[in-house]
C-alpha cells in the first residue's frame, strides 16, 4: 500500500518538480512504451509526444524518471498486486495522478492501467484484498523501505486491521496521513530510482521503474481512494511529515532526485534505498521496489535491473522493517516480508501487463494525435486556400471597381463584361443546383447512417440487457449456492431448516421479482420502440402518400401504385402482428403480476407460519414437515414463474427480431427510393414475398401498356415536333427570327415583342439549348422534357415512355388530372372576371388601369395608357379561348375512361410550364419559377405529372403573381394529387388496349386544337398581366405602407399633441396622393395623352397636370420601360427600398408598441404601488378601528351595552367600508375619465391643428394662385417677361419641362396653385408677386422660402408638380417670378420679401434671362443679411425635427425621382432638382447668379429643370421635391423658375429645390420626429407636395449671395430635421460657396465655401452659412473665417454634421483641399463637372466609399458621404471642359435614366449632374439616385453618393442618357456659359462660378440629405 501510495505521492512530488502530466506521461510511456516509441514509425503526432517526454526527462533524471515511475508504475503495481479489488480505486488514484500530472497521457494511461488492475483485481479479488491489507504495508516497507510503517498502517488499516491489531491502529493513525506521505515518498523513491536509471542512462531501469510506477499507480487508486486526502497531503509533504520527515532529512539528496518534488519525507524514504544502492542502483532499487515487489527477479530480468532491484528491495525492506519494528512486532515483519515478496511477483506480472497496456495506449494516443495533426494540417491548407481565394477575390474586386469607375468616366458599358457576368451567373446557378442535389444525396446518406446508428444503439442496449440478465442469473446462482451452503450451516447450527428454506425461497422470489422487473422494463422498452416504429411507419405512410412532392426527384419518380399497395399491405400485417404481440406482452405482464402477488402471499404465509414451525425438528429431514410442504409449494411456484419468465424472454426476443425486421424494412423503404425508370422491375422487390404471381402479371401488363403508350408517345412526339417546327417557321417569318429566346425578348421588354414572343415562347422555348439568363441545367432539362415540341423530340420522348406509361397505369392519375384541369378552369374563370374588372376600371380611368407609384410604368409607359385596355382585352379573349380549350380537354378526359391523358394538351401545357419558368425568372417571382422547374421536371417524368403539369403550367402562367402559393403547392403536390388508383393494373391494361385507337385519334385532334390555341395565347399577354398584377400589388403594398405611416402618425399625434397635428396632415397627404395615383386621378392626365404614361411613371398622378409635365413623364416612363425591362434588378431595388421602408415603419410601430407596453407596465407598477400603499393604509386604519372598538367596548362594557355597541360598530364599519369602496371606484372612474378626456382633448387639438394647417395651406394656395395669375398677367403685359415667361411656360413645359413636371405638374398654370401646392402655392404666390414686383425677388424668394419653410411642409406634395411645372417654364419666367413667392408663406417673411424685392440690393429677376452676372443685383445690404441671419438662426434649429423622414419618403422619392429623372433627362439641366439637392445650392444659385438665373432660362427649360430634378437625386427627399419642383416649377410656377431662370439652374431649380427642401423642412418642423423622410413622404404621394415648398424655397435669384446663403440656411433650418440639418449645413456650405460674394468669385468661392462650409458648414448648422452670409457676400462660404463662424453659430447642427465635418474638414477631405481646388479652378467649375470628374467625384467618391477602393486620392481619403461629396468637388474642378461636364452630366443623366427605376428624382439628379459639372453635383445626384433606388434617406445622408454611385454608375452608363446629357450640356453652354451655366450646373457652361456653386450645392445636398 505504501508503495502504491508512495508512487502516487511520488507522482505528486514529481508533479511538483515537473508538470505532473509530463512525469506521468514519461513514466507511463517510458518503460516499454519508450522502447517501442524508439522503433515506432514517425508520425506527425509524435513530435509533440517526444517533446513532452524530452521535456519531462530534461527537468532532471530524477524528476523524469520519478514522474514516469511514480505515475504509472510504483503506485499501480503495488496497488494492483496488493489489492486487486481496489483496482477501481487504483483507477481513481491514477485519475488523481493524471490530474496532478495534468496528464493527458497520464489520464489515458491510467484508464488502461485501471483496466489492467481490474483484470488482475478480478482474479485476485479476494487475495488482493487480503494482500492489500498485508502486502500493501509490506510492499511499502520493502520497496521504499521508506515509510513502510506508515504505509502498512494505511494498508493494514484497510486490509488487515484484525491481523495487525494494535499495530495496525497506530499505523492507521499515522498511516492515513503517512501513507499519503509515503506514497509521495515511495513515488519519489521510485521516481528517484527511475530518475537515477535515467541519469545513468539505464533505459531498462527507467523502464522498470516506470513500469513499477505504472503498476503502483493502479494499486494506488485503491489506496488513494482510501487516502486521497492523505496522498495529496503526502504529495504536499504534509501527510508523511510524521515519520518521513526524519528520512526526508537524511534522504534529501537521493530523494532530491526522484522525490524532491514530493514531500521531503518521501525523499527521506528514498534516501535510504538510494543510499543503499548506487545512483543507478538506487534508481533500480526504486524501480525494483515499485515494479518488483511481486518479483524483483522477474522485474530485473525483464528490465535488466535485477541486481539493482533486488538490492533495492533489500534496502527498502530493511528500512521498512526498521520502521515497522518501531510500529509492529518482529513476527509481523516476517509476515510482511513474505507478503511483499508475493506482491513483488504479482507486481512484476502486473508490470508486464501495464507495459503492454501502456504501449497500446501510446499507440492509440499516437493515432489520435496523428489524426488531430492531419486534421490541423488539412485545416491549415484550407485556410491557405481560403486566403488565396480572398486575395484573388480582392484583386477581382479592385479590378471591377476600377472598371466601374472607368465605365462611370467614359460612360461606356462593357457589353462583354455584362455577357461574361451573365455567363458566370448561369454557371453559378447551375453549380448551386448541382450542389443542392449533392446536398440532398448527402442528407439521405446521413439519415441512413443515423438509422444504422440507431439500430446499432438498440442492439447495444439489447446486448447490455441480456448481459445484465446473465449477470443477474450468475449472481442468483451464486447466491443460491451460498444460500444452500448457509442453509447447511444453519442446519449444522441447528437453525430451523424451515427458516433456511423460506429464506432461500425468499431470495429466489426476490430474484424472480428482479427478473420480472427487468422483464417489465424490457417489455416497456420494447413497447416504446414498437410505438416509435409505428409512428415512423405512420409518418412514412403519410409521406408515402405525398411521395411526389416531399421526396427528392429520384424517389418522387412517381409512386408505383402496385408497390405502394404491397408495402401498405405488409405494413398493415406487420402492425397487426405488432399489436398482437403487444397484447400478448400485456397479458404476460398481468400474469406475471398475478404470480408475483401469489408469491407475496406465499411469503407472508410462510413468515406467519415460521414461528410455529420453530418447534419442528431441526434435522435436515425437516422438508417432510408442513414448512417443507409450503417451501416445496413455493419452489413449484418459483419454477413456474421462472418458466413464465423464460417464455416472456423468448417472446420478447421474437418481438425484438420482428421489430428489427420492421426497422430494416422501414429503412429499406426510406432509403431505397424506387429507381425512376425501374418501377416495374422494383414493384415486386419490396413486398415481393407473397404476391410473386401477381407481380409477374403486373409486370407483363405494365410491359404491354408501356409498349402501347410508347408507340402513342412516339407518334405524339413526332406530331408535336412537326407542329412546333411549322409554328417556329411561321413565327420566324412573323417575328424576324426572334424566336430563339423569349427570355431575351423579355429582357428587351418591348411590349410588342413580348406578345410575339408569347406566341413563340412555347414552341421556341425548347429551341434553347442552354440556359438563358438565370436558367439552370435542371430548368433546361425541364424544358427539354416538358415541351414535346422541343427541337429534340428524341430527348423528350426517351425518358417519357416508361414513366408516362407508369403514370397512366393509375386511373387515379386521370382523376387527379381531371381535378387539376377543373381547378385550372376555375382559375381561368377568376382571371377572366378579374381582367373584365380591370378593363372596366381602365375604361373608367381613361386608359390608366393601374396608375401606381411608378410600378406600372414598365410596359405601358411606352405604349400609353390606352394600350392597356386593349392588351387586357386580348388577354381576356385568349383566356376565354383557353377556357374553351380546357373545357374540351375536360370532355376528352371524361371520354377517356382510363388513365390515358391527352398528350397534346400535355405538350402544350408543358411548353407553357417552360414558358412560365422563363417568365418567372424575369419576373419578381423568378425564384418561384426556378423552384417549380425541378419539381415539375420530376413530375413530368410521369404521364400523370405531364397532364397535371401542363394544366398547372397554364394556370401558373396566368396567375404567377396571384397564385404563387398555389404554384408551390401544386408543384409539390403534383404527385400527391395522384392518389393510389382504385382500378387495378389489369383493368387499366384492358382499357389501354380497348381505347388505344380511339385515344390516338383524339390525341391527334387535340394536338391540332392545341396548335391553334398556341398562337392565341401569347406569352406577352401573360407577362403583361403579370406586370399589371405586380404593379397593382406594389401599389397596394405602397398604399398599405402609406396608410400604416398615416396610422403611425395619428398614433404619435394622439400621444404627442404638439406639432404632431401638422405632421398628421402631412401624413395624410401621402395617403391621399397615393389614393389619387391609385384612382388614376387624371385631371391633367386626361388632358394630355403622353402624360398618362408620365403619370404612371410618377406613380401618383395629380388631378392637374401640364401637358409638358406629362411629356416629361412619358419620356421618363419610356426610359423606365427600357431600363426596367433591361434590368429586372430595378424592380428588385424598388422592392428592396419599399420593403426597407416597410421595415423601418414596422420598427417604428414596434417602438411605439414597446413604449405603450412600457407605459402599461408603468401604470401597472403605479397601480401596484398605490394598491400596496392603500393596503397599508387600510391595515393601519383597521388596526386603529380595532383599537377604537376595544376602547369603545371597554367603555360600553363599563356601561353594560357592549353587545349593542358592537353591533352598531359593525354596522358603522360596514357602512364605512362600503363608502370607501364606492369612493375608490369613483376615484378610479374619475381618473380613467380624466385620462381619456385628456387623450380626446389631445386628439382634438391635433385635429384642430391639422385643420388649421389645411386651411392655411388652402389660403396659401389660393393666394399663390392669385399671385401667379397676376404674375402671368404682368408677364403678358411686359413683352419680355410675357413672351419669354409664358412661352417658356408653355413651350418649356411641353418640351423638357414636361418631363420634370410630374403628372401633378401638368395642371395648367392657373391650376398650378391647386396642384396640392398648398403651402407652396401660398409661398409661390408671394414669390410670384415678389417676382412681379422685383425680378431680383428670386434671391429674396430663396431667402423668404427658407424663412417660410415652415409653411411649406404640408404643401410640398401638391407643390411639387407645380414646381416641376415651373421648372418646365422657361428659366426666364422663373427668374421673373423670383423665388420670393415663397416668402409669402410666412407673413412676416412675405413682408420681408416685398421689402427685399423693393430693396436696391436685390438684383431684379425680371431682367431678361440673358442678363449676365453683372445684372445680378448686389448682395443684400449687410443689415439685410444680418436680419436674414438672425431669422435663420431663429429657424435653424426647428428644422432639425423634420429630418426624421422615413422609408416612405424614400419610396416616394424613388417613384418620383424616377419620373423626375425622366423629366430631367428631357431637360438638359434640372435646375430645380439641383437646388433641391441643397437649399444652399438653391440659395447660392439664386444669389450667385441672378444673371445665371436669367441666362439659365434659355437652357433652363431643359437644362435647368433637369438639374433641379437631378439634384433631387442626392437626397431622396430632395429628389422628390425636385421632380415635383422641377415639373411644378415648369408648369404653374414657371414664373418662379423664370425668376430663377437667369440662374434657372440656380434660381428656377433652386425654387424647386428649395420647395422640396421647404417641403421637407416644413414637414420636418412638424415631423421632426419623422425627419426629412416625412417630406419624402409627401413626395411619396406626389411631387406636388414638395413642388410648392420648393417653389417657396426658390428665393429671388437676385438675392445677394450672402442673402441667398442666409435664406437658404434659414430655409434649411426650417425645413430640415436633424437629418436635414445636415442637408442644410451642406446647403449652407454650398450656399456659402455661392455666397462667395462675387458671382465670378462664387465659383472659386464655391470651392472655398464648400471646404469651409464642409469643414464648418457641413459640421455646423445652417447658422454657419448664415454667419458667413452675415460676414458678407464678399466672404466666400468656404473662407476659413466663414467656416469658423458657421461652426460657432450652430453647435447643435455641428453635432449632427460632426461626422461629415470631420472627414470633410480633415486636411484629407478638408475644406482646404476643396478651397484650393475650387478656388484655383473657380473658372473650371464646369470642368470639374467634366464627365470624368463628375463620375469620378460622384460615382467614384461615393462609389469608392462603398467599395473601399478609392482610386481618386480624395475619394480614398474620404470615408463618409460628405467626404465623398468633397472628393467629387475636388474632381470636378479638375475637368474644365464644358463638354466633359456635359459628358459627366450625361453620365449622370444616364445614371438617372437607367435609374428610371429610381424615378424622376433620379433623373433629376442625373440632369442636375449634367447641369453642375461639379462632382459635388454628381455626388448629390448620386445620393439622390441612390436614395431613389431604394437606399434610405439616411444612406443618402451618410454615404448615399457612394453607394448609390455604384449602382448609378451602371445606369449612368446608359448611352442614351449620356447623349441626352451631352445635348443638354451643349444647350447649356450655348445658353449661358456665364453665370447661367454655373447655376444650372452648367455642364456645358464655362462659367465656373455657377458650376462651382452647383457642385458645391450638390455636395452639400447629399450631405444634408
UniProtKB/Swiss-Prot annotation:
Comp. bias (Polar residues): 1744-1756
Gene Ontology biological-process annotations: cell division; chromosome segregation; establishment or maintenance of epithelial cell apical/basal polarity; microtubule bundle formation; positive regulation of protein targeting to membrane; regulation of autophagy
Keywords associated with the record: Cell cycle, Cell division, Cell membrane, Coiled coil, Cytoplasm, Cytoskeleton, Membrane, Mitosis, Phosphoprotein
Pfam families per the UniProt record, alphabetical: SOGA, SOGA1-2-like_CC
Composition skew (Low complexity), residue ranges: 63-95, 115-130, 268-283, 1678-1687
UniProt subcellular location: Lateral cell membrane; Apical cell membrane; Cytoplasm, Cytoskeleton, Spindle pole; Midbody
InterPro entries found in the cross-reference section: MTCL1-3, SOGA1/2-like_CC, SOGA_CC
Origin: domain of life: Eukaryota
GO terms under cellular component: apical plasma membrane; apicolateral plasma membrane; cytoplasm; cytoskeleton; extracellular space; kinetochore; lateral plasma membrane; microtubule bundle
Chain residue ranges for the region called Necessary for colocalization and binding with microtubules: 1-249, 1678-1773
Post-translational modification: Phosphorylated during mitosis in a CDK1-dependent manner.
Biased composition, class Basic residues, residue ranges: 22-40
Gly residues bias: start-end ranges: 680-692
Molecular function GO labels: microtubule binding; protein homodimerization activity; RNA binding
Disordered, as annotated region: 1-329, 544-563, 601-631, 671-694, 737-800, 842-867, 1080-1100, 1346-1384, 1485-1505, 1524-1569, 1655-1689, 1707-1756, 1782-1842, 1863-1905
Bias-annotated ranges (Basic and acidic residues): 601-616, 741-770, 1356-1377
Coiled-coil regions listed: 330-404, 432-483, 513-718, 1143-1201, 1238-1278
Record PTM Phosphoserine, positions in chain: 77, 87, 217, 221, 263, 549, 618, 685, 776, 901, 923, 1278, 1385, 1388, 1399, 1421, 1514, 1523, 1561, 1578, 1583, 1592, 1661, 1679, 1683, 1791, 1808, 1812, 1814
Region feature Necessary for interaction with MARK2 and apicobasal microtubule bundle formation in polarized epithelial cells, mapped onto this chain: 1265-1382
Subunit text: Homodimer. Associates (via N- and C-terminus domains) with microtubule filaments.
Primary role: Microtubule-associated factor involved in the late phase of epithelial polarization and microtubule dynamics regulation. Plays a role in the development and maintenance of non-centrosomal microtubule bundles at the lateral membrane in polarized epithelial cells. Required for faithful chromosome segregation during mitosis.
Protein name: Microtubule cross-linking factor 1
Source organism: Homo sapiens
Gene giving rise to this polypeptide: MTCL1
